[in-house]
Amino acid sequence: MNQTPLRLLIHGASGRMGQALLRLAAEHPESLQIVAAVTGRAPAQRVVDGVPFFAASELPGAPAFDVAIDFSLPEGFDPLLALCVERGAGLVSGTTGISSSQRQALEAAAASIPLVWASNFSLGVAVLDELVERAAQALAGWDCDIVESHHTQKKDAPSGTALTLGAAAQRGGAEPHYASLRAGDIVGEHLVQFTGLGERIELVHRATNRDIFARGALFAARQLQGRAPGSYRVRDLLQ
């Protein structure tokens, strides 16, 4: 039976994640169709490999889409969120640095559309998030430490993913402590350690390729299709 491809709008198409999304989505033309690629500035070419490109200022004129995937900058976030609500389209966003007012706008939009915002779209990290919460619940009174390692160009510390894992530990009743390492070209490594008397548990996730984040975002977009309005976590979409 023929399946209608999921129509995607890629917001932040000129960035590293945007380029990965365009490349990986093109590997599945039977199920994914990029109907618009949006960049901050006017594109040098209007159509590249069959994908129409738009400047951010032209966003209101984008063709119909089912889900927008956003890896851009906070200043471009508001118009995209408004367009998704107006069109009744889902939103997958990994844009970092959004303000508290933008987070409130996300919460309000979840009453109208299905959406997911995450600092990390790795499916492995989504599972780790759940494991950390369960371990914290079961190991009351144990020390909880989170050590994150990344490449030398990463400026923020602790990483957004480390803070997300810390929030999972806190939901389970633990009080996490953080340590950060910047070295070489490490894509991303997160260790969550629970230490008791005479024993410890180490939960580790290692990313060796940045494509995992783009694949996770495409997975999230597929999973949002047909879902009721609401704010979802990546781990919710695995169930």
UniProtKB/Swiss-Prot annotation:
It catalyses: (S)-2,3,4,5-tetrahydrodipicolinate + NAD(+) + H2O = (2S,4S)-4-hydroxy-2,3,4,5-tetrahydrodipicolinate + NADH + H(+); (S)-2,3,4,5-tetrahydrodipicolinate + NADP(+) + H2O = (2S,4S)-4-hydroxy-2,3,4,5-tetrahydrodipicolinate + NADPH + H(+). One of its GO terms (molecular function) is oxidoreductase activity, acting on CH or CH2 groups, NAD or NADP as acceptor. Pathway: Amino-acid biosynthesis; L-lysine biosynthesis via DAP pathway; (S)-tetrahydrodipicolinate from L-aspartate: step 4/4. The keyword Transcription regulation does not apply. One of its GO terms (biological process) is diaminopimelate biosynthetic process. Transmembrane segments: none annotated. It is found in: Cytoplasm. Keywords: Amino-acid biosynthesis, Cytoplasm, Diaminopimelate biosynthesis, Lysine biosynthesis, NAD, NADP, Oxidoreductase. InterPro entries: DapB_C, DapB_N, DapB_N_CS, DHDPR_bac, NAD(P)-bd_dom_sf. (S)-2,3,4,5-tetrahydrodipicolinate binds at H151, G160, T161. Catalyzes the conversion of 4-hydroxy-tetrahydrodipicolinate (HTPA) to tetrahydrodipicolinate. This is 4-hydroxy-tetrahydrodipicolinate reductase.
